[in-house]
Amino acid sequence: MNSESKCYRFYICFARLGSGMIAGLMPVHEIELSPEQASALDLLRSGENVFLTGGAGSGKSFLIRQFMRELDPKEMPILASTGAAAVLLGGRTFHSFFGLGIMEGGADATYERASKDKRLMSRLRKVEGVIIDEISMIPGQALMIAEALSQRARESKLPWGGMRVIAVGDFAQLPPVTHTGQRDWCFLNGVWEVSGFQTVMLSHNQRVSDNLFLDVLSDVRHGKVTERVREFLNEHVQDHDEDDPGTRLFPRKINAEKFNERKLAEIDETEVVIESIYSGSERHIETLKKASPIAEKLILKIGCQVMFLQNDPQRRWVNGTRGTVVDITADQITVRKDRGREVQVSKSSFAIQDAEGNIMAQVEQFPLTLAYATTIHKSQGATLDDLWCDLSQLWEPGQAYVALSRLRSAKGLHLIGWNPRSIIVDPKVLHFYKQFEGL
């Protein structure tokens, strides 16, 4: 084994979502960590408040998965920034866990309302800490209220009342979600400095090995339209080939849906409609339908292109793996992966939880979606081998970077067009990350 790496043996607990019972305990293969990853894992284990960051493909999610295997999720819950992410994580949202709701009436009204919630106060006293996933999408005001509520619940003036906080994400990707349209970056709020985060900056891209592509991604992440960026993007511009199987990334949902419908209609096979099976109260099911990336009906045909929506515990696929449907039965779909063998896919359970971690509603469905097109936003976290994208009319900071950084290799990049004005980064984000250069 390489003397510059550490080797850890991890054990995975397999549990049916919502059952509360561990179904089995089994060893998995030893995982060799790079010095950077091993150092990051040591800091995660240290008990300090940690900010785990790095560009796309740097292994943030991988490290958190390893760390979580050592923990009781009741003592250290993982909190998602959006409802859709919470459904895929099998967790709770940041806003629901801290009783923030939609923050109606502003910060003061939200704090007063939440501080009177006895269940919330009890919940914040019981946990050892929280892991906040995709921290870039949490507004600063929400983080500030959550910290104040933690202090009140735990009757302590320590940051977060002594509760541990691990923040994970990349501020150079998608910005915070707010109702005002303002970018309320949480690192600009005073609570960020008070939290005393120890920063881990993962610098090695685990997804891409092409040095030129890595340099281009770095430039785009920093909002730099350098000569090499111009040359690189221009080289990949081509007329749209409707028959090419690569995934299309659109900035808007409606365009992705229409493209998927059109490509499915072109296949001369019988359409198979698989209804999602819901359980829970009617009200909670409606909430799940709005938040979930799982459609009410999965419509497929033999020969259609599909994409996996979640990582497989047995490592047969990851979020973003593509393949072709070769067989469909009531209980199983056989998919021939683009890069590998055929796999049999069973249904998964996806759920929304209340603030206490109890299942409110869940849905059973195959963890698949049509792969002809998706949105840039939904592609975050996915790894693609082939994509088509138009970078001409983007408007959000980080959109171009998220799109380009989905790829393993530049060989799979097809650009319909691009515009320098679409390569955007917030100057405040650039200034924030300068302090970590050299970490």
Swiss-Prot record:
SMART domains referenced in this protein's UniProt entry, alphabetically: AAA
The family assignment reads: Belongs to the helicase family. PIF1 subfamily.
Q: Which UniProt keywords apply?
A: ATP-binding, DNA damage, DNA recombination, DNA repair, DNA-binding, Helicase, Hydrolase, Isomerase, Nucleotide-binding
KW DNA-binding (keyword) present: yes
EC numbers listed for it are 5.6.2.3
Quote the PANTHER family the UniProt record gives: ATP-DEPENDENT DNA HELICASE, ATP-DEPENDENT DNA HELICASE PIF1
Which EC class does it fall in? isomerase
Gene of origin?
Answer: pif1
Source domain of life is Bacteria
One Pfam family of this chain:
Pif1_2B_dom
Q: What does this protein do?
A: DNA-dependent ATPase and 5'-3' DNA helicase that efficiently unwinds G-quadruplex (G4) DNA structures. May be involved in resolving commom issues that arise during DNA replication, recombination, and repair.
Q: Name one GO molecular function term.
A: DNA helicase activity
The keyword Glycoprotein is annotated on this UniProt entry? no
Quaternary structure annotation from Swiss-Prot or TrEMBL: Monomer.
Gene Ontology biological-process annotations = DNA recombination; DNA repair; telomere maintenance
Catalytic reaction equation(s): Couples ATP hydrolysis with the unwinding of duplex DNA at the replication fork by translocating in the 5'-3' direction. This creates two antiparallel DNA single strands (ssDNA). The leading ssDNA polymer is the template for DNA polymerase III holoenzyme which synthesizes a continuous strand; ATP + H2O = ADP + phosphate + H(+)
What is the protein named?
A: ATP-dependent DNA helicase Pif1
- Requisite cofactors: Mg(2+)
